Amino acid sequence: MTEKIYDAIVVGAGFSGLVAARELSAQGRSVLIIEARHRLGGRTHVVNFLGRPVEIGGAGVHWCQPHVFAEMQRYGFGFKEAPLADLDKAYMVFADGQKIDVPPATFDEEYTTAFEKFCSRSRELFPRPYSPLDNHEVSNLDGVSARDHLESLGLNELQLASMNAELTLYGGAPTTELSYPSFVKFHALASWDTITFTDSEKRYHVQGGTNALCQAIFDDCRADSEFGVPVEAVAQTDNGVTVTLADKRVFRALTCVLTLPTKVYADVRFEPPLPPEKRAFIEHAEMADGAELYVHVRQNLGNTFTFCDDPNPFNAVQTYAYDDELGTILKITIGRQSLINLENFDAIAAEIRKIHGDVEVLEALPYNWAMDEYARTSYPAMRKGWFSRYKDMAKPENRLFFAGSATADGWHEYIDGAIESGIRVGREIRHFMKATA
């Protein structure tokens, strides 16, 4: 029997890989999807907590994000709204652990002031945000850290602490490491509007969950698939690509799409080796040390939101669900998981009590993306000096094509960026196949 040679092997079944596979199969190409996990979704995933579906990875979507909105429209998915409006209570925990109760309207006003000052040049720097490097000043500013810029703005204590908490969440590292313009780009992508940006990151999720949207895209692929075994090696010649799995099975194709989280590339042997600029990006560019956590509290805390400044381990703590019978489910976004042992229930409970007083913490559901061997980072946050080099990672290498949200021109820490990159590599391979036919 003749060995099958695919037109394309797609490594990874997150949004970028699934969209790439669908685009290629729609061109009539034969496609094989290889996924190390036993599921779809990559760094998005829905699990059950107290009988409720909860997102433990990437989840924020919005109609200002054109690629994910198009997929939601295509497959008939609406928006689920998080309970962030009409807060009952808002809190700020400062770097030294001091907590203050802030009237929600004041909290919103002070944070918005800080955010708009931080992003005040977003239209000037990113007049066309899907061509983020067209303005050469962006590359010149890439070496400026978010913290350096933040401290230049003359903010008051609450403004500085709340914005630094937000930036720590996005950077997954001390804000002295995060590229200033890499964050400002998000404001530009949200039509240079702060409320739109905040809604895109915290307010709206996919109705039915990211799992269901991934499944809809997968069902639209005419592709073979292999789940549960990681890729060990990728070798290319002038004539094709050979992909070897950890169980030593070998698959061959004319092209290969790689959608691995950036730091996971170091676990794959490439022959010939990837070029120096890609290897440097893999080693140095990203730093997001993040995790997600849900906590069940016996008391009904109402609708609350808390920012905790670095080095507090919990950066954003918000009510997910609440009533007198349930008590409260809190959703916690952690920029730096290394600051707390998420396997230690008592440590988690102690942090919750720093915010909400003497409450009874009943249960916790953590997911540590930074310690996940198939993720290594929670999202592609860009270290200062590296945002301007993202195209080094996106550039094809002969028969190898690179996707994943880190390679996106637009929303690089979001589902939208992943989908954008999958569409791009579908186009790149179509052109490549025509040129080499």
From Swiss-Prot:
Pathway membership, UniProt: Alkaloid degradation; nicotine degradation; 6-hydroxypseudooxynicotine from nicotine (S-isomer route): step 2/2
Free-text cofactor note: Binds 1 FAD per subunit.
Reactions catalysed according to its record: (S)-6-hydroxynicotine + O2 + H2O = 6-hydroxypseudooxynicotine + H2O2; (S)-6-hydroxynicotine + O2 = 6-hydroxy-N-methylmyosmine + H2O2
Pfam families recorded: Amino_oxidase (PF01593)
Source domain of life: Bacteria
Activity at various pH: Optimum pH is 7.0. Stable between pH 6.0 and 9.8.
Protein name, UniProt field: (S)-6-hydroxynicotine oxidase
Lineage: Bacteria, Pseudomonadati, Pseudomonadota, Alphaproteobacteria, Hyphomicrobiales
Gene designation: nctB
